[in-house]
Amino acid sequence: GIAVAYALAILDSSEIAHPPIEAVFTVDEEVGMLGAAAIDVSDLKGKLLLNVDSEDEGIFTVSCAGGATATCILPYNKDMINAKIIEMRLDGFTGGHSGAEIHKERANSNCVLGRILLNVFENIDMRIIGVNGGEKDNAIANLSEAAIAVLPECVDRAKEIINKVFDEVKDEYKVTDPAMKITLNVMDSQLVEAMSGPSTLA
């Protein structure tokens, strides 16, 4: 809002000296830069873009920044296997805004989940059933979930690896994320559809 008012005030004034100005106003930026993605810039002539933004009242940040959203579609194969299911939930992370708080070096629950899954996969026969890491583009994730399938005889080893890696991470981020925790739920053996071994690795 302040940037809109600022630009309109300059354009309306006959006393403020300035070069030619093109004011661009878009909407739906906090939910995914939708306005910026849809705008037709072919009529714009300016060579310098200024963005007025800030997270703190009374402070102007005059800059230019951009963002990119990548959509990755990975084909994968599924198998029906008889296995136990380990559900894991990582939460209690501090999280935050990826623009305003990225410099605070907080843990990202999605990155931690990936680290855990990789370690389990490297040590036992594990298949991914599903993962969920949230939907926000501009967030340092604070909650992640996954379900994996493992052979009954590998459950204890899997839990040992999961807890070991999580303890390492918790120690690394003990200052920024003191409340992070992991919850494991082991379900009885059953016939379950899960990613194939190569697809899990990918």
Segments predicted by a language model, with ranges:
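Acidic/histidine-rich catalytic neighborhood of metal-dependent amide-processing enzymes
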Residues: 1-77, 127-129
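Alpha-helical metal-binding/catalytic segments enriched in His/Glu/Asp
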Residues: 1-30, 86-90, 97, 104-120
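Functional cores that coordinate and move charged inorganic groups
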Residues: 47-49, 54, 62, 66, ...
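Flexible, low-complexity linker/loop segments at domain and module junctions
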Residues: 78-85, 139-141
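Metal-dependent amide/peptide-bond hydrolase catalytic core
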Residues: 110-202
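Short amphipathic
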Residues: 70-73, 84-92
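Solvent-exposed residues in well-ordered beta-strands and their adjoining turns
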Residues: 26, 53, 75, 91, ...
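Short acidic, glycine/serine/threonine-rich loops at helix termini
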Residues: 33-39, 60-65, 100-103, 141-143, ...
